[in-house]
Swiss-Prot record:
Disulfide bonds: none
Full protein name: dCTP deaminase
Signal peptide: none
UniProt keywords, alphabetically: Hydrolase, Nucleotide metabolism, Nucleotide-binding
Entry EC no(s): 3.5.4.13
Any one Gene Ontology molecular-function term assigned to this protein's record: dCTP deaminase activity
Organism whose genome encodes this protein: Acidobacterium capsulatum (strain ATCC 51196 / DSM 11244 / BCRC 80197 / JCM 7670 / NBRC 15755 / NCIMB 13165 / 161)
Role description: Catalyzes the deamination of dCTP to dUTP.
Family membership: Belongs to the dCTP deaminase family.
Gene3D superfamilies: 2.70.40.10
SUPFAM superfamilies: dUTPase-like
Pathway: Pyrimidine metabolism; dUMP biosynthesis; dUMP from dCTP (dUTP route): step 1/2
One Pfam family here: DCD
Length: 183
């Protein structure tokens, strides 16, 4: 299994792996996004779900209460101290059968105590990415829409997998927006 370069990512993007695709890394006046040497910095859209405790809900992944969130559409969002938000990528991904991705947070946000978690994109997964954003600080933290949030690294297996995410009809296949926990 090897990490894939900018050349490979560009070739695959032209075949529809990433839409829309920014062929160059955009850095001027924004938190960077677009193609990098060995990855792709995705952008966060302007759709956010911020955790709130207004309804005194308990977070239960088997019985998730949507009232645990406040939905926000904005150019930026404030994540409360020691809190959490969900968002989605601007980019839509179609992962090849012999590829697995890993997502890592951007250092600009990490240095401010904002941690991004995204599970791997499995072979033949497709959709908009639901992004998990944690504010680990005791202060409110700002996240900017339409700018970079995390970097996707692409790894190609030595051979295609036997059973892909599409084959097993994964529950998060073809996500069209922010998708909450499912069983």
């Amino acid at each position: 299994m090897s990490i894939k370069s900018d050349r490979w990512i560009r070739e695959q993007a032209l075949k529809g792996m990433i839409e829309p695709f920014s062929e160059k890394q955009v850095r001027e006046g924004v938190i960077s996004y677009g193609l990098s040497s060995y990855g792709y910095d995705l952008r966060v859209s302007n759709e956010f779900k911020i955790f709130t405790n207004v309804n005194s809900a308990i977070i239960d992944p088997k019985n998730f209460d949507e009232r645990s969130f406040v939905t926000v559409e904005a150019d930026s969002v404030i994540v409360p101290p020691n809190s959490f938000a969900l968002a989605r990528s601007i980019e839509y991904f179609r992962i090849p059968r012999d590829v697995l991705t890993i997502c890592v947070g951007k250092s600009t946000y990490a240095r401010c105590g904002i941690i991004v978690n995204v599970t791997p994109f499995e072979p033949e997964w497709e959709g908009y990415v639901t992004l998990e954003i944690s504010n680990t600080t005791p202060l409110p933290a700002k996240v900017y829409a339409n700018e970079g949030l995390c970097q996707i690294l692409f790894f190609q297996g030595d051979e295609p997998c036997e059973i892909s995410y599409a084959d097993k009809k994964g529950k998060y296949q073809n996500q069209q927006g922010i998708v909450l926990p499912k069983l």
